[in-house]
Amino acid sequence: MTSPQDKRRALTPEALAMMDTIARTGSFAAAAREMGRVPSALTYSVRQLEDTLDVLLFDRSSRQAVLTSAGQELLVEGRRLLQELDAVANRVRRIATGWESELTLAVDDALARRAVFDLM
């Protein structure tokens, strides 16, 4: 039986990006071309991921890469996680460079508030 730590280690950003590429391109061959790998390497990686998670991610009865319901769930959540990772990296970079994520405006009564809001 695979431990929870092993399952977490298998769900790398690279594995999630691979799943996204396969689903987006519709085939292992097209995904492999896009990723600069050979199809057998992707097939092996997907099988390793399936074995670790103990689920089938793709229906192999057709030539196209068709996700199972478990594969679809991993794709949706994986895309969300990849977006979160990108957002974290952007926030860290902004903090490191001194870019402020908040802007505070003080508006005097001499300015029409509506005009200020229109500028935003």
Where do the model's predicted regions map?
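The N-cap/first-turn positions of alpha helices
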Residues: 12-15, 39, 71, 78
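Residues within the DNA-recognition helix of helix-turn-helix
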Residues: 38-41, 45-48, 119
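Short alpha-helical "packing" element that flanks the helix-turn-helix/winged-helix DNA-binding module
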Residues: 15-22, 74
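Short helix-boundary/capping micro-motifs
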Residues: 21-36
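Alpha-helical residues within the helix-turn-helix
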Residues: 33-34, 51, 72
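Interdomain hinge and pocket-entrance segments immediately C-terminal to HTH DNA-binding domains
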Residues: 93-112
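Alpha-helical linker/hinge and terminal dimerization helices associated
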Residues: 52-53, 74-96
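A short LG(V/I)-centered, amphipathic sequence patch enriched
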Residues: 50-69
